[in-house]
Structures are given as structure tokens and as C-alpha cells.
Amino acid sequence: MNVSKARITAIGSYVPERRLTNDDLEKMVDTNDEWIVKRTGIRERRIAADDEFTSDIGYKAVQDLIARYEKSVDDVDMIIVCTFTPDFKTPSAASLIQAKLGIQNTGAIDLNAACAGFTYGLHMANGLISSGLHRKILVIGAETISKVTDYTDRTTCILFGDGAGAVLVEYDENEPSFVSFNLGSEGERANKLYCTGLAEQMNGEELVNTGNLVQSGREVYKWAVNTVPAGMKAVLEKAAMKRNEIDWFVPHSANLRMIESICDKSGIPLEQTLYSLVQYGNTSSATIPLALDIGVREGKLKHGDNVLLYGFGGGLAHAGLILRWTVPTEKN
């Protein structure tokens, strides 16, 4: 039974101005445009300026939301920022965004579930609002992955970019957005995708490339193309829905080949899939809100559409949900 009382009422996004194309990368590492497109589907990614950080781009995504939907955020009572690249270890990026927005009397927390972060953030927002503890929550997926990317490592630097997306979630028991969720984590595989912190070992393995993102691409690929279809099946069962009732599938935009394999295994046509990787690369927790906003701007997402979101990545963690699209037509 659906007990959600939370509705997504607005969306916004922001990407930095600087473009890093495949041709640019060809001058930096042993690669080329054809090789990158064939294996990943990515054509370019955005890169934050030296003085531009996660709180800055997250704030700009909220500003976009406010301008397009004429929303006030003065009475927001919780800010959840989903990121693994905060400006500082402390204070949180959420607190910095709260200050930039000038909101008083609001909670502010960062949530680190890497590429599954945004879907975990929506899960938290739905629970906090449906329980009656909160009425209005900003959920922001924002990353500046370029600042933890080794641009001599072609296995990672071709993939990642920077960007931010934000949604406003409000109390509404008459037209809730959220239908069902499915969450999971396999920490025993944590050393397949990591960015080092204080510890120098994980699962008995010496960690490498201190301070930068490290990925065992083939291992993560094999895990994702099996785990995500199973998770999609579970979230459909919890909603008592069939896959042909889904209008749009929005997976984490890690790699187009991976998305194609997930679609093939789950029986969802690629034509019903929204992704943001072609123009923005893998932006971790920002890929799903960026893809949703692309769907809005291109007129694909319609009121009442059933949308299946699935985030997956570092942890290795995953989180999926089904929502009914309830965002009204933007005012501007």
C-alpha cells in the first residue's frame, strides 16, 4: 500500500561552462573520440572552474528551480545534498547551500552514496515528509568529480564530469509522487570503486592513487548489469506494476553500453530511457536529476507518467524507485 505523502513539485539543474570534449582528451591521454564513443557513449563533459565547488553548482541548480517554477524556498525545513565531492570534509555542502540561499531554521545534511546518492536522497525525503516530521525538502545531487580525477588515467578521466540537479519535495497527501523503493548495498565489493580518505587499506587490499577516484571498470560493469535488473524487478513487484506500465526509465548515467545491457536484461526499450551522459559524462549523484531535467526541457516527461529511477555505484550501493511525475509546467 502506498503511504507516501510527498510530491516533487519543481526541478532545476546547472552545469559548469567549460566543456571537455573527446578531442581534448585525445591530447591528454592515449585515446580518441571513436574509442570513447564506442565504449561509453560520452561525447563531452563539463568541468568546474578552479574556484567553483560542489556547493556553488548545487546552489545554482536550486536558483534554476526557483526561477523556472517561481517557488519560494524560504520555508524549506531540510536540505539534503547527495555528493561524494563536498567542498570540505566539514562543514557540509548542505550547510553552505543553506547559507547561500539565506534559509533560516532548516536542517542541512550531506548524504554520500556516490552514484546512488540521488535516489537515496529521494528515499529519505519521502520518509521524512510522509512521517510528518518535515513539510518541504530540497534534494540536490551535485558533484565536482574533476577535482578528484587523475587526468593521466584514461580509464577514469574519459568518464567523469561535473554538474548538479535539484528537486523540491513537498507535503501533498492528495497527489504523492512516490510509489515504491528498493535499496541495497554490497560493501564487500567496496574496493571496486573508491576515492581514498583516511584509511590506506580496504577489504585487505592496499589502496592506490591517493585522493583520486579509482574504478575496476569491468568488475563494476558485471555487478551493475546483474544487480540493477534484479532491483528493477523488485521495485516493480513492490508497486504491483508490470514493466509495460513504465513510461520512462532513468538509470544512473554511467556508461551507455551498460545502460543498453540493463535495458536488454530488464525488457525496457532504450527509446524509453532518459540519460545525461552524452553531453555531461558520468556526474555520479547528479546524473539522474540532470537526465530528468533533460526530459522536462525536451517535453518528454508528462504529468502522470510512471518513471522508474535506478541509481548504482560506489559502495557498492544501489537504490531504485518508481514515481509518478507530478511536476507542473514551469512558469518561466
Curated annotation (Swiss-Prot):
Active-site residues are C115, H252, N282
The segment annotated ACP-binding runs over: 253-257
Q: Does the keyword Acyltransferase apply?
A: yes
Q: Biological process (GO) annotations?
A: fatty acid biosynthetic process; secondary metabolite biosynthetic process
Q: Which key words tag this protein in UniProt? A: Acyltransferase, Cytoplasm, Fatty acid biosynthesis, Fatty acid metabolism, Lipid biosynthesis, Lipid metabolism, Multifunctional enzyme, Transferase
Any single GO CC term annotated in Swiss-Prot or TrEMBL for this entry: cytoplasm
Which EC numbers does the record give? 2.3.1.180
Query: What GO MF annotations does this protein's record show?
Result: 3-oxoacyl-[acyl-carrier-protein] synthase activity; beta-ketoacyl-acyl-carrier-protein synthase III activity
Q: Give the enzyme's main class according to its UniProt record, as a single word.
A: transferase
Q: In which pathway does it act?
A: Lipid metabolism; fatty acid biosynthesis
Name the Pfam families on file. ACP_syn_III, ACP_syn_III_C
Catalyzed reactions per annotation: malonyl-[ACP] + acetyl-CoA + H(+) = 3-oxobutanoyl-[ACP] + CO2 + CoA
| Family the entry assigns | Belongs to the thiolase-like superfamily. FabH family.
Q: How does it assemble?
A: Homodimer.
- This protein's name: Beta-ketoacyl-[acyl-carrier-protein] synthase III 2
Which species? Halalkalibacterium halodurans (strain ATCC BAA-125 / DSM 18197 / FERM 7344 / JCM 9153 / C-125)
